[in-house]
Protein backbone atom coordinates (compact mmCIF):
# COMPACT_ATOMS: atom_id res chain seq x y z
CA UNK A 1 0.00 0.00 0.00
CA UNK A 2 2.86 2.36 0.65
CA UNK A 3 3.91 2.64 -3.01
CA UNK A 4 0.32 3.53 -4.00
CA UNK A 5 0.16 6.23 -1.33
CA UNK A 6 3.51 7.62 -2.41
CA UNK A 7 2.40 7.72 -6.05
CA UNK A 8 -0.77 9.62 -5.12
CA UNK A 9 1.27 12.14 -3.18
CA UNK A 10 3.60 12.71 -6.11
CA UNK A 11 0.68 13.13 -8.52
CA UNK A 12 -0.94 15.59 -6.14
CA UNK A 13 2.20 17.69 -6.05
CA UNK A 14 2.49 17.64 -9.82
CA UNK A 15 -0.88 19.37 -10.17
CA UNK A 16 0.06 22.14 -7.73
CA UNK A 17 1.38 25.46 -9.17
CA UNK A 18 5.16 25.79 -8.97
CA UNK A 19 4.81 28.96 -6.87
CA UNK A 20 2.20 31.28 -5.47
CA UNK A 21 1.85 34.69 -7.08
CA UNK A 22 2.50 37.81 -5.01
CA UNK A 23 -0.83 38.67 -3.31
CA UNK A 24 0.02 42.40 -3.34
CA UNK A 25 0.56 42.54 -7.11
CA UNK A 26 -1.88 42.28 -10.00
CA UNK A 27 0.86 40.98 -12.29
CA UNK A 28 0.65 37.47 -13.74
CA UNK A 29 4.38 37.03 -14.04
CA UNK A 30 3.91 33.30 -14.54
CA UNK A 31 2.64 34.28 -18.02
CA UNK A 32 4.84 37.24 -18.92
CA UNK A 33 7.77 38.98 -17.23
CA UNK A 34 9.29 42.41 -17.68
CA UNK A 35 12.93 42.21 -18.79
CA UNK A 36 13.68 45.91 -19.23
CA UNK A 37 12.01 49.27 -18.57
CA UNK A 38 12.72 52.60 -20.25
CA UNK A 39 11.26 55.75 -18.69
CA UNK A 40 10.96 59.04 -20.57
CA UNK A 41 9.64 61.59 -18.09
CA UNK A 42 9.25 65.31 -17.47
CA UNK A 43 9.19 66.69 -13.94
CA UNK A 44 6.61 69.42 -13.38
CA UNK A 45 7.16 71.04 -9.98
CA UNK A 46 4.27 73.47 -10.41
CA UNK A 47 1.77 70.60 -10.67
CA UNK A 48 3.84 68.04 -8.69
CA UNK A 49 3.70 65.44 -11.45
CA UNK A 50 5.88 63.26 -13.63
CA UNK A 51 4.55 62.73 -17.14
CA UNK A 52 5.76 60.82 -20.18
CA UNK A 53 5.89 57.14 -20.99
CA UNK A 54 7.15 53.80 -19.76
CA UNK A 55 8.35 51.29 -22.34
CA UNK A 56 8.42 47.69 -21.11
CA UNK A 57 10.38 44.92 -22.84
CA UNK A 58 8.63 41.62 -22.22
CA UNK A 59 9.45 37.92 -22.06
CA UNK A 60 6.33 35.86 -22.74
CA UNK A 61 6.24 32.56 -20.84
CA UNK A 62 2.75 31.34 -21.75
CA UNK A 63 2.12 31.00 -25.52
CA UNK A 64 -1.62 31.45 -24.97
CA UNK A 65 -1.42 34.65 -22.92
CA UNK A 66 -2.93 37.76 -24.54
CA UNK A 67 -3.28 40.09 -21.55
CA UNK A 68 -0.66 42.13 -19.73
CA UNK A 69 -1.66 43.06 -16.17
CA UNK A 70 0.33 45.82 -14.49
CA UNK A 71 0.29 47.52 -11.10
CA UNK A 72 -0.61 51.20 -10.87
CA UNK A 73 -1.74 53.63 -8.18
CA UNK A 74 -3.27 56.97 -9.11
CA UNK A 75 -1.79 57.04 -12.61
CA UNK A 76 -3.68 58.79 -15.41
CA UNK A 77 -3.20 56.48 -18.40
CA UNK A 78 -3.43 58.36 -21.69
CA UNK A 79 -2.49 55.71 -24.24
CA UNK A 80 -1.11 52.18 -24.58
CA UNK A 81 0.72 50.89 -27.66
CA UNK A 82 2.22 47.54 -28.61
CA UNK A 83 5.18 47.00 -30.94
CA UNK A 84 4.21 44.66 -33.78
CA UNK A 85 6.42 42.34 -35.82
CA UNK A 86 7.01 45.07 -38.42
CA UNK A 87 8.36 47.43 -35.77
CA UNK A 88 5.24 49.61 -35.80
CA UNK A 89 3.53 50.90 -32.67
CA UNK A 90 -0.16 49.96 -32.71
CA UNK A 91 -2.88 51.02 -30.23
CA UNK A 92 -3.79 48.49 -27.54
CA UNK A 93 -7.08 48.67 -25.62
CA UNK A 94 -6.81 48.90 -21.85
CA UNK A 95 -8.93 49.16 -18.71
CA UNK A 96 -8.20 50.35 -15.17
CA UNK A 97 -9.82 48.60 -12.22
CA UNK A 98 -11.32 50.45 -9.28
CA UNK A 99 -8.85 51.63 -6.65
CA UNK A 100 -7.98 49.14 -3.93
CA UNK A 101 -6.66 50.94 -0.82
CA UNK A 102 -3.82 48.44 -0.40
CA UNK A 103 -2.91 47.37 -3.94
CA UNK A 104 -3.83 50.36 -6.08
CA UNK A 105 -5.34 49.72 -9.51
CA UNK A 106 -4.79 46.94 -12.02
CA UNK A 107 -4.04 48.08 -15.56
CA UNK A 108 -5.31 45.40 -17.96
CA UNK A 109 -3.89 45.62 -21.49
CA UNK A 110 -5.64 43.48 -24.11
CA UNK A 111 -3.32 42.29 -26.87
CA UNK A 112 -3.98 40.63 -30.22
CA UNK A 113 -0.45 39.18 -30.23
CA UNK A 114 2.52 38.85 -27.89
CA UNK A 115 4.55 42.03 -28.43
CA UNK A 116 8.19 42.33 -27.52
CA UNK A 117 7.44 45.80 -26.12
CA UNK A 118 4.55 47.89 -24.87
CA UNK A 119 4.56 51.64 -24.34
CA UNK A 120 2.30 53.37 -21.82
CA UNK A 121 1.78 57.15 -21.82
CA UNK A 122 0.80 58.38 -18.38
CA UNK A 123 0.96 61.06 -15.70
CA UNK A 124 1.40 60.66 -11.96
CA UNK A 125 -0.91 62.11 -9.35
CA UNK A 126 0.23 65.14 -7.28
CA UNK A 127 -0.18 62.94 -4.21
CA UNK A 128 1.69 59.91 -5.59
CA UNK A 129 2.66 57.76 -2.60
CA UNK A 130 6.29 57.35 -3.68
CA UNK A 131 7.04 60.96 -4.60
CA UNK A 132 7.77 63.68 -2.06
CA UNK A 133 7.65 67.21 -3.48
CA UNK A 134 9.39 69.71 -1.20
CA UNK A 135 8.91 73.46 -1.33
CA UNK A 136 11.99 75.72 -1.36
CA UNK A 137 11.35 76.44 2.33
CA UNK A 138 11.98 72.75 3.08
CA UNK A 139 15.50 72.83 1.61
CA UNK A 140 18.73 74.23 3.03
CA UNK A 141 19.02 77.14 0.61
CA UNK A 142 15.34 77.98 0.68
CA UNK A 143 15.61 78.92 -3.00
CA UNK A 144 14.65 75.89 -5.09
CA UNK A 145 12.21 72.98 -4.76
CA UNK A 146 13.25 69.36 -4.32
CA UNK A 147 11.73 65.97 -5.10
CA UNK A 148 12.71 62.48 -4.02
CA UNK A 149 11.14 59.03 -4.23
CA UNK A 150 10.59 56.19 -1.79
CA UNK A 151 9.35 53.20 -3.79
CA UNK A 152 9.61 50.63 -1.01
CA UNK A 153 7.56 48.52 -0.39
CA UNK A 154 4.97 48.65 -3.21
CA UNK A 155 4.91 52.33 -4.13
CA UNK A 156 6.86 52.20 -7.40
CA UNK A 157 3.46 51.65 -9.02
CA UNK A 158 2.50 55.21 -8.05
CA UNK A 159 5.08 56.69 -10.45
CA UNK A 160 5.34 54.04 -13.19
CA UNK A 161 3.09 51.23 -14.49
CA UNK A 162 5.03 48.09 -13.62
CA UNK A 163 4.98 44.52 -12.43
CA UNK A 164 5.55 45.93 -8.95
CA UNK A 165 6.75 42.85 -7.11
CA UNK A 166 10.19 41.59 -5.99
CA UNK A 167 9.42 38.41 -7.95
CA UNK A 168 10.25 40.36 -11.14
CA UNK A 169 13.63 41.96 -11.77
CA UNK A 170 14.51 44.11 -14.75
CA UNK A 171 17.19 46.40 -16.12
CA UNK A 172 16.20 49.98 -16.83
CA UNK A 173 17.14 53.21 -18.54
CA UNK A 174 15.65 56.68 -18.25
CA UNK A 175 15.57 60.10 -19.86
CA UNK A 176 14.30 62.79 -17.50
CA UNK A 177 13.84 66.51 -18.06
CA UNK A 178 13.65 68.95 -15.17
CA UNK A 179 13.63 72.73 -14.64
CA UNK A 180 16.89 74.56 -15.31
CA UNK A 181 19.16 74.66 -12.29
CA UNK A 182 17.99 71.31 -10.91
CA UNK A 183 19.99 68.08 -11.21
CA UNK A 184 18.36 64.68 -11.61
CA UNK A 185 19.89 61.57 -10.03
CA UNK A 186 18.62 57.99 -10.08
CA UNK A 187 19.41 54.52 -8.76
CA UNK A 188 21.49 53.92 -11.89
CA UNK A 189 24.71 55.09 -13.53
CA UNK A 190 24.97 58.83 -12.82
CA UNK A 191 27.42 61.03 -14.72
CA UNK A 192 28.70 63.64 -12.27
CA UNK A 193 29.93 65.73 -15.24
CA UNK A 194 26.53 65.86 -16.96
CA UNK A 195 24.93 69.29 -17.35
CA UNK A 196 21.35 68.22 -18.02
CA UNK A 197 21.24 70.03 -21.35
CA UNK A 198 18.65 68.15 -23.36
CA UNK A 199 17.71 66.08 -20.33
CA UNK A 200 19.36 63.67 -17.92
CA UNK A 201 20.13 60.10 -19.01
CA UNK A 202 20.56 56.98 -16.89
CA UNK A 203 21.25 53.28 -17.34
CA UNK A 204 20.96 50.42 -14.86
CA UNK A 205 22.50 47.34 -16.53
CA UNK A 206 21.83 44.99 -13.61
CA UNK A 207 18.35 43.57 -13.00
CA UNK A 208 16.62 45.06 -9.95
CA UNK A 209 13.17 44.72 -8.34
CA UNK A 210 10.80 47.64 -8.76
CA UNK A 211 11.08 48.85 -5.17
CA UNK A 212 14.69 49.85 -5.90
CA UNK A 213 13.65 52.34 -8.58
CA UNK A 214 14.64 55.73 -7.19
CA UNK A 215 14.84 59.33 -8.36
CA UNK A 216 15.90 62.61 -6.81
CA UNK A 217 15.66 66.11 -8.31
CA UNK A 218 16.99 69.26 -6.73
CA UNK A 219 19.75 71.84 -6.46
CA UNK A 220 22.56 69.32 -6.13
CA UNK A 221 26.33 69.32 -6.38
CA UNK A 222 28.55 66.27 -6.84
CA UNK A 223 31.74 65.57 -4.93
CA UNK A 224 34.12 62.67 -5.62
CA UNK A 225 35.15 60.54 -2.63
CA UNK A 226 37.29 58.02 -4.51
CA UNK A 227 37.75 56.25 -7.82
CA UNK A 228 34.17 54.86 -7.73
CA UNK A 229 32.53 56.61 -4.79
CA UNK A 230 30.89 60.01 -4.53
CA UNK A 231 28.20 62.07 -2.87
CA UNK A 232 25.44 64.40 -4.09
CA UNK A 233 24.04 67.06 -1.79
CA UNK A 234 22.73 70.60 -1.70
CA UNK A 235 25.47 73.23 -2.18
CA UNK A 236 25.24 74.35 1.45
CA UNK A 237 25.74 70.78 2.65
CA UNK A 238 28.14 69.25 0.12
CA UNK A 239 31.30 70.14 2.06
CA UNK A 240 30.12 68.66 5.35
CA UNK A 241 28.61 65.64 3.58
CA UNK A 242 31.90 64.89 1.80
CA UNK A 243 33.77 65.23 5.11
CA UNK A 244 31.37 62.91 6.91
CA UNK A 245 31.55 60.28 4.15
CA UNK A 246 35.25 60.61 3.34
CA UNK A 247 36.03 56.99 4.26
CA UNK A 248 33.47 55.46 1.90
CA UNK A 249 36.09 54.20 -0.56
CA UNK A 250 37.96 52.49 2.30
CA UNK A 251 34.69 50.96 3.46
CA UNK A 252 34.04 49.47 0.01
CA UNK A 253 37.59 48.12 -0.13
CA UNK A 254 37.17 46.52 3.30
CA UNK A 255 33.94 44.85 2.17
CA UNK A 256 35.67 43.59 -0.97
CA UNK A 257 38.44 42.02 1.10
CA UNK A 258 35.79 39.92 2.83
CA UNK A 259 33.25 39.21 0.09
CA UNK A 260 34.91 39.80 -3.28
CA UNK A 261 34.68 42.56 -5.91
CA UNK A 262 31.93 45.17 -5.63
CA UNK A 263 29.56 44.41 -8.51
CA UNK A 264 27.53 47.60 -8.89
CA UNK A 265 30.16 49.79 -10.55
CA UNK A 266 29.85 52.98 -8.50
CA UNK A 267 28.87 53.61 -4.90
CA UNK A 268 27.29 57.06 -4.76
CA UNK A 269 25.18 58.61 -2.02
CA UNK A 270 22.49 61.28 -2.06
CA UNK A 271 22.15 63.41 1.07
CA UNK A 272 18.62 64.78 1.20
CA UNK A 273 17.39 68.05 2.72
CA UNK A 274 16.99 68.26 6.52
CA UNK A 275 13.22 67.75 6.17
CA UNK A 276 13.79 64.16 4.94
CA UNK A 277 11.81 62.10 7.50
CA UNK A 278 13.49 58.70 7.10
CA UNK A 279 16.88 57.44 8.27
CA UNK A 280 17.90 56.22 4.82
CA UNK A 281 17.15 53.97 1.88
CA UNK A 282 19.65 51.76 0.08
CA UNK A 283 19.42 51.63 -3.71
CA UNK A 284 21.80 50.11 -6.28
Where do the model's predicted regions map?
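Short structured motifs
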Residues: 22-24, 36-42, 103-109, 156-161, ...
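Intrinsic-disorder/low-complexity, polar/charged segments enriched in Ser/Thr/Lys/Arg/Asp/Glu/Gln
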Residues: 36-38, 49-55, 65-67, 106, ...
Amino acid sequence: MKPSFLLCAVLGLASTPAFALDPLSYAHYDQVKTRDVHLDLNADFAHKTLSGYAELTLDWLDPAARTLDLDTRGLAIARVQALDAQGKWTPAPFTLDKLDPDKGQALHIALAFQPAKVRIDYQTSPDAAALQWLTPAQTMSGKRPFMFSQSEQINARSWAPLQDTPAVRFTYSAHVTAPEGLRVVMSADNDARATGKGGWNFTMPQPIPSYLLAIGIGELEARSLGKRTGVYAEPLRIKSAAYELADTEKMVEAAESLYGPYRWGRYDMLVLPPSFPIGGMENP
